[in-house]
Structures are given as structure tokens and as C-alpha cells.
Design a protein with these regions (language model features):
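Extracellular polysaccharide-recognition and catalytic grooves
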Residues: 1-169
């Protein structure tokens, strides 16, 4: 159990100082290849993989500690979700093909299963994950956000409200 905990804590480490590290940043953005904003690239893969382990190991002797689950939730709900509106992901690099065959115009579809897993695995924030999931699967005038969010480590800003959203890098 200790080895599993240590590994998963390492995978979801949060960079708390101003040194460059490839990790989730204090502002809930994700760095890779130095100081490069990859929340919807490598960060998406990290969210997919970590949500799988959090989900699959829940209610076992190897279940992931609440601190890691909270960090995972913060990364999505307090960071990445500000980059998603409908099936559009802002700053998606397009190095993988879009999922036109299943009706999505961008890569946001990749978040559907991980969000479903987190709804089950993190019931205290299930409603927040559900809003992000609804935003992807059934886009409406709102993406569940209302206000401004600035990822100061990555220089990325979002302003969202019903019927309107703008992101700047």
C-alpha cells in the first residue's frame, strides 16, 4: 500500500513554489517540457489515468488517500474546467485526431469517462464534476462557470458567464 501511495502522490504532485517543474501548478494548470502550458495535453492524460486509479482502487486496501483525490478535483474543477466550453477545449494542440465520428468537434470527449469515474469516486464534489460533464455532453448557454479565473503560473485567463466565454493566453 505504501508503495502505491508514494507512486500516486508522485504522479499528482503539485508545484507549490516558483521553480519550473513538470507537474500540476499551484494555480491548477499543468506544465510539461519546462514552462509550457499543457493542461489539455499531458494534463488531460494525467487526469484520465489518475481518475482510473482513484476509481478502480476505491473501497480496497489500496484506495487513494483523500488528499490526492482533492488535488485531482482541484486540478479539474478549479483549473482545467475553465478551459472547456461545450465540446471546445481552448488551447488544444490538435496532435491527435478529433472525434468527428462520435459527434464531437474537438477533444473534450476525452474527459467524459474520467469525469464519470470522479463523480463516483469523489462524491463530495460529484455535483461539480457533473456540471463539467453536462457542459461537454449537452452544451447549453452556461458551462457552469460565472466569473474570472487566471492561471498566473501559465499566463492563461478565462472569463465565463451564461451565453459568453472568452479565454486568453
Amino acid at each position: 500500500k505504501e508503495m502505491v501511495d508514494d507512486y500516486l502522490n508522485y504522479c499528482l504532485s503539485t508545484q507549490l513554489d516558483d521553480k519550473t517543474a513538470e507537474a500540476v501548478q499551484i494555480d491548477n494548470s499543468f506544465y510539461m517540457h519546462g514552462k509550457q502550458f499543457y493542461s489539455n495535453g499531458y494534463g488531460m492524460s494525467m487526469f484520465r489515468d489518475m481518475s482510473f486509479w482513484i476509481y478502480i482502487l476505491r473501497e480496497t486496501q489500496f484506495s487513494i488517500g483523500q488528499e490526492v483525490v482533492t488535488r485531482m478535483g482541484n486540478y479539474m474543477l478549479n483549473g482545467t474546467s475553465w478551459t472547456i466550453r461545450g465540446d471546445i477545449i481552448e488551447l488544444y494542440l490538435g496532435y491527435r485526431p478529433y472525434k468527428f465520428d462520435v459527434g464531437y468537434q474537438n477533444y473534450a470527449e476525452e474527459y467524459i469517462e474520467p469525469l464519470k469515474r470522479m463523480i463516483t469516486a469523489d462524491p463530495s464534489r460529484a455535483n461539480e464534476y457533473q456540471k463539467v460533464l453536462n457542459n461537454i455532453q449537452n452544451p447549453t448557454e452556461s458551462n457552469g462557470k460565472n466569473g474570472n479565473y487566471y492561471m498566473w503560473r501559465s499566463g492563461y485567463g478565462a472569463h465565463m458567464k451564461d451565453g459568453y466565454g472568452v479565454n486568453i493566453k
